């Protein structure tokens, strides 16, 4: 986001007026803005750390990343420090190795889930 981008700009002495996450991602993926690439790389690393913490807190077997801008840069995420940071939990790294990580790319997962739940409920009602 803009705060992370501002921190990278300050650290590198660069400044470009990119404030929207979508603009930062576009500039990073197009490769013409080094600070945008560094910002996106930092975002992926932080996301990996947070996702690893959440997986441990909840005893997850799968981590689902949904919504936002992540579906736009899955290849970048795969080549980033995301997984390294996800696993960097000391003695818990072995457990996290077995945790599946998925990015939901469907544009309406909430509606899809609601439709599936409704279908299941209707099937149960019909079976009675």
Describe each PLM feature range:
Residues 1-128:
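ATP-binding/phosphotransfer module of carbohydrate and carboxylate kinases, centering on a glycine-rich
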């Amino acid at each position: 986001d803009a705060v992370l981008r501002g921190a990278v700009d300050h650290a590198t002495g660069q400044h470009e007026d990119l404030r929207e996450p979508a603009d930062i991602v576009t500039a990073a993926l197009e490769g013409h803005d080094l600070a945008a690439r560094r910002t996106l790389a930092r975002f992926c690393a932080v996301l990996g750390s947070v996702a690893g913490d959440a997986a441990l807190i909840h005893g997850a077997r799968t981590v689902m990343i949904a919504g936002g801008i992540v579906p736009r840069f899955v290849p970048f995420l795969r080549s980033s420090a995301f997984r390294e940071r996800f696993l960097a939990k000391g003695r818990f790294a072995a457990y996290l190795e077995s945790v599946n990580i998925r990015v939901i790319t469907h544009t309406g997962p909430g509606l899809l889930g609601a439709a599936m739940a409704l279908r299941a409920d209707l099937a149960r009602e019909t079976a009675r």
